[in-house]
């Protein structure tokens, strides 16, 4: 819940000097990316910008405090300020910020700018007190913001120092409007106006000018002088002489003498107590100070000129001038030290009553009241956890004694989930084990079950499926039906374990159950996870179309719940890329993989390994070995600088081994084979993939017997577990083994099986990747004209893809080849006496490559009737009567020239 006063522009006060010269400068702010107002405290930055903002509608205001160094809090308020300026135009960003569904501030801002692209009128965003930001991540994100913000948006930053926002670059490009302390300082004329409206007896212009010079036009000093002159009999000039040369860090003594010592004791205590509040309203004041009619008291303080300002148009929220507020808080620690804990407790209670637990925690921490902090956490911690207030929760839990956590195991569980969310898996188990050792009777019942559900999640994340299964089953046995979150976790883990074991049907059912529960209780990240798992399972079973449809449901969920920036989004677009690649939709597959990299742009480069492997796979399917090599260099660098799950390593190894096969790099394959992991089992698609990598390397090295043993065992497992996509891949690799070993009939047999199975999987690129050896076999099958219709159609499609991406599109009948052919001593006399034209040679090459007449016409960009003429002519010159005879003739010519066909 956001505090309204932090998003309200300060109300323009009566008796303020209108800074006409500065307002004139600010009138052109819409021509700049950044308007920067910098000066020490008390120079009137906020007052000036509130005057400038008066009457503007398309403006958002965000007043910072120390707590805004938390990235999530900063994001929530900044987006809320933009929503304020645009009347709710950026709904997607607002939801993402509220639910913390973004990868980083920069990615959230990128989405913001997409939405703002449709907002065409001038827009202003004011951030006050930016000097309070010390978080380097926020600084970097705001630099990104300024670089990429729309042209019609102007950012207005108020700060006591020069912020780390790339100011020099903006200045050079004339995109910065600056107002500093020298310009903010009051002129003689402004000082005279100020005193005239503050003092009952006007002072002479010369006197006013001298006072202004004495304090260098410092607005706060002028305000103190006016206050002192009203409260005392001595002259304004005497106060000015005392203030001359004093700056904000040396004001304490003066403020004690001239302000606190000149108000009655009740007002003094009111000021000191209320100052602990970063913002205040009637209810807070009444509870903290003990005075009735808090609103009236605040208005009275405002009228006395005691540095109190309204924060919103309703007049409900107030705050002290930062300079005066800091002074009062320091004095409160000195003068009311004994009462201070009780004052903070009162503030915490009032904030809680108004529904602001994070503010209440701030005061409970300041009070050092562990019991109050514990009670707030017990009631609100999980809500704060679900809203990613992780830093605040961590600080709060550290402030509680261990005994308090033991007395409230829910807080131990919360601390463990915090650790899990930060991937500190070892610490989770240590914490839970310590708690179980020290908490009596916790080894049974609901809390123990919740511990086990979390432990199960940690175990599966850490690559221990057997332990994860044991713990998930224990949790589900003990958890009551109403403990939905832990039941969702345990069910999801159990489904993932069964997936790892290759029990796909049972795993699919559990993941569907997880999805149903997660949707019912709005646990969207587990709903998304379960859909991704379902898609992977369906892919493994060979039901790629159903996997596609499940992915569509996942994309719809992401759009509806604005989950675009969760890391799981990358997982989804990556498995979509794998499916598109299988279907030879390479451009779409590549685009999907690149979008996955974009999702992970704010994370460590190692996280991009899988998408990078997918890009390499696309290059390999196109036969683009130069590009594949370039990308492989980066992939191998990432492999050497990270620790990865075995599935990730297997996918990375796959593209490496295929590349070595295509380039004939036996040395690299042999070296890899000596060192690579050889899994104990092959009962899921991760392990099948690694063993397939091993078999491919063995085939490249001529170790056919070893490779055949591996592949036969893989096929046995794949058939028994119904891993149909793996079976399809295994058959293709077995085909290559038989072909290279000279076992042509066995090669044809398993190729026919692979083509038949591809009717279910839809595989294309898995055939294409095998290149010319696959093309030769498919040409022979097509020539035999015995394939069923579906297999015939698929074989022709695969052949077209190979011809497009591997070797030459026109077989080998280019100009150089034809010249060498005609000079060959064994060339048929018919060809020598009646030579084909260059175009007819091209047509012959395309016929040999399996192209139909329509496809040849499309390839050569001529009419189909023209192609028929070319075919008739070349048939006559070759002395053949039909297409199959032409293919056989071309094959003889290629063999004569030394090409293996």
Swiss-Prot record:
InterPro entries: P-loop_NTPase (IPR027417), Sig_transdc_resp-reg_C-effctor (IPR016032), TPR-like_helical_dom_sf (IPR011990), TPR_MalT (IPR041617), Tscrpt_reg_HTH_MalT (IPR023768), Tscrpt_reg_LuxR_C (IPR000792), WH-like_DNA-bd_sf (IPR036388). Residues 829-894 form the HTH luxR-type domain. SMART domains: HTH_LUXR. The keyword Transcription regulation applies. GO terms for molecular function: ATP binding; DNA binding; DNA-binding transcription factor activity. Keywords: Activator, ATP-binding, Carbohydrate metabolism, DNA-binding, Nucleotide-binding, Transcription, Transcription regulation. GO terms for biological process: positive regulation of carbohydrate metabolic process; positive regulation of DNA-templated transcription. Activated by ATP and maltotriose, which are both required for DNA binding. ATP binds at residues 39-46. Residues 853-872 bind DNA. The keyword Magnesium does not apply. PANTHER family: DNA-BINDING TRANSCRIPTIONAL ACTIVATOR DEVR_DOSR (PTHR44688:SF16). HAMAP family: HTH_type_MalT. Monomer in solution. Oligomerizes to an active state in the presence of the positive effectors ATP and maltotriose. NCBIfam families: PRK04841.1. Belongs to the MalT family. Positively regulates the transcription of the maltose regulon whose gene products are responsible for uptake and catabolism of malto-oligosaccharides. Specifically binds to the promoter region of its target genes, recognizing a short DNA motif called the MalT box. This is HTH-type transcriptional regulator MalT.
